[in-house]
């Protein structure tokens, strides 16, 4: 994080986060909070997952978490586990009025965000449908949105018969479908 800020001459809050699969979205949440608190006027948030060693695959295989097919058949009865991969994603965030004033192209509006952790569940990699539903409901409330207004949901969905089902249940309950 410091190297990027140095080379791009960025100032303001600067830190790296580690929250497993949710690190990138946690970074977006933290960046949006920094903007709301006037700690900065623009934020760069993102996530990186680079598997640079076979140790990761060995650990997943030992835990019986690796999928047998690629791509992983998410939300499917044929789901057999995760297929890890490398990825890098980053976005620039700005307050809406500032982006309009500066003539920036606006690709989306983050109406609200929130963070939670599921606590003790069936296992460390297993989500809690109740806590996920509560978080979704909290974000909808903060954004003043009715569940019927939701047009798209981006899900974690790793291709696991257990966790995909739990995530589906959580989203369905929160959106009351």
Regions found by a protein language model. Name each.
Residues 1-177:
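Condensing-enzyme catalytic core of the thiolase-fold
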């Amino acid at each position: 994080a410091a190297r990027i800020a140095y080379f791009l001459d960025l100032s303001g809050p600067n830190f790296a986060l580690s929250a497993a699969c949710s690190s990138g979205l946690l970074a977006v949440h933290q960046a949006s909070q920094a903007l709301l608190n006037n700690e900065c006027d623009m934020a760069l948030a993102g996530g990186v997952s680079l598997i640079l060693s076979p140790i990761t695959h060995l650990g997943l295989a030992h835990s019986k978490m690796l999928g047998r097919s690629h791509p992983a058949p998410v939300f499917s009865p044929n789901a057999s586990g995760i297929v890890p991969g490398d990825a890098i994603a980053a976005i620039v965030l700005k307050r809406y009025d500032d982006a309009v004033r500066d003539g920036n192209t606006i690709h989306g509006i983050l109406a609200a965000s929130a963070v939670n952790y599921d606590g003790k569940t069936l296992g460390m990699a297993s989500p809690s449908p109740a806590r996920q539903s509560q978080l979704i409901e909290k974000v909808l409330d903060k954004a003043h949105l009715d569940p019927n207004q939701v047009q798209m949901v981006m899900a974690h969905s790793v291709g696991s018969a257990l966790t995909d089902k739990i995530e589906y249940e959580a989203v369905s309950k929160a959106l009351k479908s």
